[in-house]
């Protein structure tokens, strides 16, 4: 028998009741089977479509096989590095149902990133897409805790298909509790070292009942499509938590979300809800193949990851007649806690708090700011907050302060009560919605034979979106020029995830520094 949560939406915020024995995967799947949606399509991916019944069987087989075939125990961890498609929800939910903790990770990283995450998490199993296997194959035997490498989309005895074939279609959910560890996501840190962000079973349904139903207005008959991938907290809600919470259908796309790829899915599947990020919205509007008004049937669009430029929002609304509901969420809070909403969209702001979450702004002295127009660090209190960073007590203590979670973002509240983004509290950059450490990019640049010193800052492009810009001091004997710029960009792309490379490189004689030798990035940002 399924153990389901119940939400009463006659109140604001809704009253959410979660039983003492509770498994998030059991809830998200079981509610749809009990509601008679077994024959309804839940996912459409690049290979075909799948019903709720088919998903339930795949999840049971996966949970059963992880526990019995591979011998995983409750709270053991499995790394999930899988391109968007049916294999992601199969593995993610299958692990959760079995009491195993899945760790969804970015599919765009490097071999060294993956080695760090495998070592840090001590995951016993990694499930990876066939396309990513060359990056993971060297890990077997190199990372001592890794026992099994399972290939999604592959063939043979190590494939996910072969593993599922060993599992049972009848599988009872592990007797987990709402506050048991459920899954991890990795969040970047100020030094570039990722942090394992630990979420519990009750977090998923809270995001659906507090944001997706009342703010976004998602409903059973909707088809939804998220350009943000499932390994992001934003994408996980968009393409997995929210559609399953209401019985909707989600479109999944494995390839990179270029304007052309997104246009094709929008035209073919005609989603009711589209989830994007500012960089993509700007690129789509600038593309000559952008759909015309009346070509799509969009009812709602959302944006997160970075602040949506006001001009982009207004141009999108003018073209399609539908607003973009810009908001802010985080890996730590799992999804959006501050948002514009239908009928109350103020472009250039992140809107107002989602009911069920409390926000405060704190100044540099630790005092709460109550005056409009004064910027401070945004802190959040809400039921979907992560409980810790794995194996990182210092940063856990610095971020999770009792009921409050620090965002690292600076905000101000304008005279009308809407929250306006005012930058990062540290030097971290948000590039296409993904945090980038300038220190990591600087280290890669300095590894080039021509570079003596490097400093990286955030710089606005023509759409007012932030991208990395590098200021370079060359070693004696090297000359500045376009050929070297091109070589440096390629060098960074070769060492780091491609989105981290500097879009602009400026050669300078020296870098501004403090008396103690610390680079003064604020002077470069205003240069």
Swiss-Prot record:
Its EC number is 6.2.1.25. Optimum pH is 8.5. SUPFAM superfamilies: Acetyl-CoA synthetase-like. GO terms for biological process: secondary metabolite biosynthetic process. Catalyzes the ligation of benzoate and CoA to form benzoyl-CoA at the expense of ATP. The enzyme also ligates 2-aminobenzoate and CoA. The enzyme shows activity toward a number of benzoate derivatives. This is Benzoate--CoA ligase. GO terms for molecular function: ATP binding; benzoate-CoA ligase activity. Gene3D superfamilies: 3.30.300.30, 3.40.50.12820, 3.40.50.980, Luciferase, Domain 3. Induction: By benzoate and 2-aminobenzoate. It is an enzyme of class 6 (ligase). The keyword Amino-acid biosynthesis does not apply. Belongs to the ATP-dependent AMP-binding enzyme family. Benzoate-CoA ligase subfamily.
